[in-house]
A protein has these predicted regions:
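Ligand-binding clefts of soluble mixed alpha/beta catalytic domains
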Residues: 1-349
Length: 349
């Protein structure tokens, strides 16, 4: 249906998990496609509240075939994301299996809820039958798995109400219709005095410091709504405001960055394959949303070595550089310590 969220006209698609686990029937496909077409014609955001077991397999002969079968949903997802720049925001509100998982994965951003969200191509029972592996749902595809390990999802909330509140905040800062500027609100002073920034940086550029303290002196109220905070912590990405204007922020974190249990620490100021992919996705999203990007760089370059090469550092780095180079929004660069190597160029140098 159609509604208003945070003052914005939006299209909403929501599954009812009390009816056949929210599975897709032939009529479901027709309704989703119609909703997507309205969003594309009107150029308004579309919100997916997903709680679906995917296709109702006994009825798949009416779901898959034809020009307007289930695959067209994903075609429309891709059109909106790559060409039309129609914002797509998904919340995984329950179990999302197979096609129910691809729908949010093709959105711009994904919100998940701790303890109740599940997203995967197959559930624990299917995994047990297909591979013999016994795994619980949270480990297989829960909110922490997808916001800390797989990086498929981008924001994690403690409960449904918090998830919906965060979605409202996100929608409230989305780009306005063509020709209308982003909403500018009353500015707040930074959390730290800008003049104090000089005392925060070490005299020796090799020593560590917390980049968040630098951002405290730049951003309104020092507030950064961080994007994927538990993924690639050596790179900070997020949404903020400066003088009341919305901006996207990308910054290098310094020091030794602790990894997940069993994972080796990373060196701050170095771009790893995982951080390159995280930043590339964030740049592409900010570009679609028409947000200026502030790069706060303190970078020594890209990671080298056999492990980095095996992880595809060249491919990931190229994705980072391509996203930065092709973004058409304003890019502002602040070098706070030093910048060198290809990392300088990747960080919009």
């Amino acid at each position: 249906g159609l509604g208003v969220v945070a003052g914005r006209d939006v299209v909403i698609v929501a599954n009812d998990a009390t009816v056949k686990a929210g599975s897709w029937w032939p009529e479901t496909i027709t309704k989703i496609l119609r909703a997507q077409e309205i969003a594309m014609r009107q150029r308004i955001p579309i919100v997916y509240l997903v709680d679906s077991a995917g296709v109702n397999l006994p009825y798949q002969e009416g779901v898959f075939p034809g020009q307007y079968g289930a695959a067209r949903i994903f075609y429309y997802n891709s059109l909106m994301r790559r060409y039309l720049h129609v914002p797509q925001i998904s919340a995984v509100m329950g179990s999302c299996i197979a096609g129910g998982a691809y729908l949010p994965a093709l959105s711009d951003v994904i919100f998940m809820v701790e303890g109740t969200s599940f997203m995967g191509l197959g559930g624990p029972n299917l995994v047990k039958g297909a591979t013999g592996q016994t795994v619980d749902g949270e480990t297989l595809g829960g909110a922490r798995t997808h916001t800390e390990i797989s990086a498929v999802a981008h924001y994690r909330a403690p409960d449904d109400a918090s998830c919906l509140d965060r979605m409202r905040e996100y929608i409230g800062r989305l780009p306005r219709p063509a020709g209308v500027a982003h909403a500018v609100i009353e500015s707040k002073p930074p959390a730290a005095e800008p003049a104090a920034l000089y005392g925060m940086l070490p005299a020796d550029h090799r020593l560590s410091y917390d980049m968040r303290h630098i951002l405290d002196g730049l951003l309104d109220g020092g507030v950064l709504d961080e994007f994927q905070p538990d993924v690639a912590r050596e790179m900070l990405c997020g949404h903020a405001r400066i003088e009341g204007r919305p901006v996207a922020v990308i910054a290098n974190q310094r020091g030794v960055i602790k990894g997940r249990p069993g994972e080796r620490p990373k060196f701050g100021g170095i771009i790893y394959p995982e951080s390159a992919e995280k930043v590339a996705f964030f740049i592409e999203t900010a570009n679609r949303e028409g947000l200026p990007i502030l790069f706060v760089q303190d970078v020594s370059g890209f990671m080298v070595g056999a492990e980095a090469e095996h992880a595809g550092i060249i491919r990931a780095g190229a994705h980072f550089v391509e996203a930065m180079a092709t973004a058409s929004v304003p890019k502002i660069v602040l070098t706070v310590n030093h910048a060198s190597g290809a990392g300088y160029y990747a960080m919009a140098g």
